[in-house]
Amino acid sequence: WFLYDEPKQELVTYYGDYFRKVNFEIKPLLVKIFTEEFSKTDIGGTKIKNPLEYILLLTSELKTQRPESTTIAFFLKQQGMDLFNPPNVKGWDGGKSWLTSQIYLQRNNVADLLSSGKSIPRSKLERENTLNKKQAFSISLDWNTKGTNKEIIKELTDRLLFSTDTSLQQDLEKILKYDFDPQSLGANDAVLRLFNAIIKSPEFQLI
């Protein structure tokens, strides 16, 4: 649950045997899992972000003003995570259930809104009004204001993604081009467009 959405059967057996060995004590089991699994180098991209992890990471990166708890709760419910009201004692299914086509579309819409400094609307009328508003709140993204386009792309992808490939790199270089000037008037907006593209990528949905 902490590291894998779908752990391999040998891991389940390995830790299950240890759990029995320590007389079903939770603490030593968790210590063993965290000690052994977190030290591995290949655990990146093994879990899909749940809605809470997703929205908190976005608001943290953009340094938004503290969102209203009701707004966050509304977004989570839209995503199928009615906070403090799981469907059963097991909790939410998690895993691939956090990345249906509808949920992915909702996430991308929220990414667009937050990257342009707009709040998450909670009603049809509010959605229509939000689309026509200028920035509803200030946002601030940390990036190297002296870097080249490739250096800034690397900075953000290293921070936000567990891995990249040539195709994604090329797509990002089309957004933040080789002649990018970090001191130009529109530099921050250009980097925000890059950030928006990264957080809308399938790779960003993974931990």
Where are the model-predicted features located?
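Flexible, low-complexity segments enriched for small/polar residues
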Residues: 1-22, 27-207
